[in-house]
Amino acid sequence: MKRDIHPEYVETQVSCTCGASFTTRSTIESGTIRAEVCSECHPFYTGKQKILDTGGRVARFEARFGKASAGSKK
């Protein structure tokens, strides 16, 4: 690697809108990152995720074409 071309790697405080915060390392000069979601509040990590079926599209598709098993052909 060439000398004196890489940015400084400093400790960075990451804070989320949910109130959680943790320390990591980054090249951001300010030393702070504000995030909207993190592993503490994201639905995937908290287990509170919901599958939204907007307007019953899946049910309408299954009613129209039937619920075929994987690998079956007509």
From Swiss-Prot:
GO aspect biological process, one term: translation
PROSITE patterns: RIBOSOMAL_L31
GO cellular component: ribonucleoprotein complex; ribosome
Keywords: Metal-binding, Ribonucleoprotein, Ribosomal protein, RNA-binding, rRNA-binding, Zinc
Family from the record: Belongs to the bacterial ribosomal protein bL31 family. Type A subfamily.
Function: Binds the 23S rRNA.
Name of the protein described by the UniProt record: Large ribosomal subunit protein bL31
Native organism: Streptomyces coelicolor (strain ATCC BAA-471 / A3(2) / M145)
Lineage, highest ranks first: Bacteria, Bacillati, Actinomycetota, Actinomycetes, Kitasatosporales
